[in-house]
């Protein structure tokens, strides 16, 4: 993993919006977040990737697939995975990005699992990286207390004791509950200039959706794999972590 050095505490945020350390901690469990001052999304992704490669004890040229999950790429194109490829020297890898916000890494991992299971690729580098500080409205208390910048990476290969089961769902009808507008909304023919889109969230709706749907997904994957909740350690469950309450 990799996080930038700059720390923004809850007390720092209390100088920007009407909030305080106790309010944030009691509702989210968050005490501080990291904010990038010099790193780009691909910089953070590459630094996390380099650490994962080193820990895996492999040569970067052994990697034949790179999947980067991000909602804040450096460019529209080339994709961020290609930038990571160049920075870590994984010259033999096919590269693409996945945009799925909070669930991005889970979707990227499941995609790598499918490719490796099919035999098409052998060694995948899966990365989740976001520079959300540039998408957050720092005057919006409902979002600015929740998000920061950072990256995590994993080297994925086939193994007998690997992924036991997957359960993926989407509900596009709820997309407006947590969203960030496109920054290419201008139209030169109509004289409309692009507007900066910032993240917006209906917190209660997100909470209600998560507490209902996530347990159902867990139940489904347990049934599909012939397991029970009692038999599975939480350390073997990979899901999006939102806050201490969720």
Which residues fall in each region the model found?
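Condensing-enzyme catalytic core mediating Claisen C-C bond formation in acyl metabolism
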Residues: 1-38, 140-208, 212, 216
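Conserved catalytic cysteine-centered active-site region
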Residues: 23-27, 31-43, 71-124
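Phosphate/pyrophosphate-binding loops at sites that engage ATP/ADP/AMP, CoA/4′-phosphopantetheine
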Residues: 48-63, 217-231
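Short acidic capping loops at alpha-helix termini that bridge into adjacent secondary structure
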Residues: 59-65, 92-94, 122-124, 228-233
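Short beta-strand segments
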Residues: 69, 99, 124-130, 156, ...
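Flexible, glycine-rich active-site loops centered on histidine and acidic residues
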Residues: 117-151
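Conserved small/polar residues in nucleotide/adenosyl-binding loops
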Residues: 235-242
């Amino acid at each position: 993993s990799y996080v930038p050095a700059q720390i923004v505490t809850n007390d720092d945020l209390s100088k920007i919006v009407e909030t305080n350390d106790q309010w944030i901690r009691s509702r989210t469990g968050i005490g501080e977040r990291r904010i990038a001052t010099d790193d780009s999304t691909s910089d953070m992704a590459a630094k996390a990737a380099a650490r994962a490669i080193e820990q895996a004890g492999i040569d970067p040229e052994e990697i034949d697939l790179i999947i980067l999950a991000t909602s804040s790429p450096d460019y529209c194109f080339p994709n961020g995975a290609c930038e990571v490829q160049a920075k870590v020297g994984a010259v033999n890898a096919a590269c693409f990005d996945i945009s799925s916000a909070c669930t991005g890494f889970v979707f990227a991992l499941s995609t790598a699992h499918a490719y490796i299971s099919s035999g098409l690729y052998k060694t995948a580098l899966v990365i989740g990286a976001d520079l959300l500080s540039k998408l957050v409205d720092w005057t919006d208390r409902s979002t600015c207390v929740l998000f920061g910048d950072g990256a995590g990476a994993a080297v994925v290969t086939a193994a007998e004791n690997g992924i036991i089961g997957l359960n993926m769902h989407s509900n596009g009808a709820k997309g407006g509950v947590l969203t960030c507008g496109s920054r290419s909304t201008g139209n030169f023919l109509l004289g409309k200039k692009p507007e900066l889109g910032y993240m917006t969230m209906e917190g209660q709706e997100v909470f209600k959706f998560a507490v209902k749907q996530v347990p159902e997904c867990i139940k489904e994957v347990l049934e599909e794999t012939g397991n029970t909740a009692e038999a599975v350690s939480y350390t073997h469950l990979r899901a999006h972590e939102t806050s201490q309450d969720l």
